[in-house]
Amino acid sequence: MRVTAAARSLLLTEFVSAFFLAMRYFFKPKPTINYPFEKNPISPRFRGEHALRRYPNGEERCIACKLCEAVCPAQAITIEAGPRRNDGTRRTVRYDIDMVKCIYCGLCQEACPVDAIVEGPNFEFATETREELYYDKAKLLANGDRWEREIAKSIELDAPYR
């Protein structure tokens, strides 16, 4: 027993086996990506930066039902509804989301009956101040306009699971 242990120690068998294992992985393609220049594909269910969507005719989708405000566990959404129109519909006067409070749970998106509020594919929205993370209606609509194609595609891919 002592002789085999001494032979292993003298011949450095563990070191040699570890070296060959390292060399095998050294020449394989790397599993990491060069992040700012390469990006992994994002799941259709990814929950990123919030956006308010519009109908194809340009009218905003939000009907001021306030379900998203009621269901938000972090109480990050504030909505003020405008007066009823002649056709009986309402629109929001104020729609604010405090992204510092938001926990990105997606309950607002699930509660919305007209798919007005969605969480888009953007995850790169770091800011220098906290005030920039307080999104108003104009910022949310701009996000919706910017990411509409990706958001519509994600909703279409996720439709069988809704």
Swiss-Prot record:
Gene3D superfamilies: 3.30.70.3270. It comes from the Bacteria. The keyword Zinc-finger does not apply. One of its GO terms (cellular component) is plasma membrane. Its EC number is 7.1.1.-. Keywords: 4Fe-4S, Cell inner membrane, Cell membrane, Iron, Iron-sulfur, Membrane, Metal-binding, NAD, Quinone, Repeat, Translocase, Ubiquinone. It is an enzyme of class 7 (translocase). [4Fe-4S] cluster 2 binds at C72, C102, C105, C108. Disulfide bonds: none annotated. This is NADH-quinone oxidoreductase subunit I 1. It comes from Rhodopseudomonas palustris (strain BisB18).
